[in-house]
From Swiss-Prot:
PROSITE patterns: HTH_LUXR_1, HTH_LUXR_2, RESPONSE_REGULATORY. It comes from Salmonella typhi. Interacts with RcsD and RcsA. Residues 168-187 bind DNA. Component of the Rcs signaling system, which controls transcription of numerous genes. RcsB is the response regulator that binds to regulatory DNA regions. Can function both in an RcsA-dependent or RcsA-independent manner. This is Transcriptional regulatory protein RcsB. The gene is rcsB. Residues 5-124 form the Response regulatory domain. One of its GO terms (biological process) is phosphorelay signal transduction system. GO terms for molecular function: DNA binding. InterPro entries: CheY-like_superfamily (IPR011006), RcsB (IPR030864), Sig_transdc_resp-reg_C-effctor (IPR016032), Sig_transdc_resp-reg_receiver (IPR001789), Tscrpt_reg_LuxR_C (IPR000792), WalR-like (IPR039420), WH-like_DNA-bd_sf (IPR036388).
Amino acid sequence: MNNMNIIIADDHPIVLFGIRKSLEQIEWVNVVGEFEDSTALINNLPKLDAHVLITDLSMPGDKYGDGITLIKYIKRHFPSLSIIVLTMNNNPAILSAVLDLDIEGIVLKQGAPTDLPKALAALQKGKKFTPESVSRLLEKISAGGYGDKRLSPKESEVLRLFAEGFLVTEIAKKLNRSIKTISSQKKSAMMKLGVENDIALLNYLSSVTLSPTDKE
């Protein structure tokens, strides 16, 4: 089996440590870089001979952003780099939008010790990886009748930040878009999800996330 060079990006040092220790148990994996913000990650990518990037969805870095914005930048400028998203965000609408970016895998942090090795093994065989836990979450969209009303990546990014507690003005600044654009994208997403106000939106985002009984 060919060796796989991997970069890890997460803004929590303890998470970086845990992932690295887990990957060190796989003899054909080499960790060639670790970064805590997107700016350092992007600045160093050209210098590293990496096959795979394992990155958190929410990560600081003013210049290149995070989440879907960062992933799209990497896909555009480093097309040969495989991407596995590691995230605490278990909202199915957002996970669906991330998968639409044609990444190689997505892993919830709750299941990372088990699912990351599986994702890398799938990559070795030229396959993509979606764990059962994520597949179950995505089924909730279809069960709720929203399967034919998929959020666009930009709408998903706005909802992700809204769910994290950011105001529309703060989201606009973070994503370098106008307040009017952010408001329009938020409204469009709400119409697709069938919710009429912010309280209903937050209730929806909460209700379709992973419940304790769903965790593996």
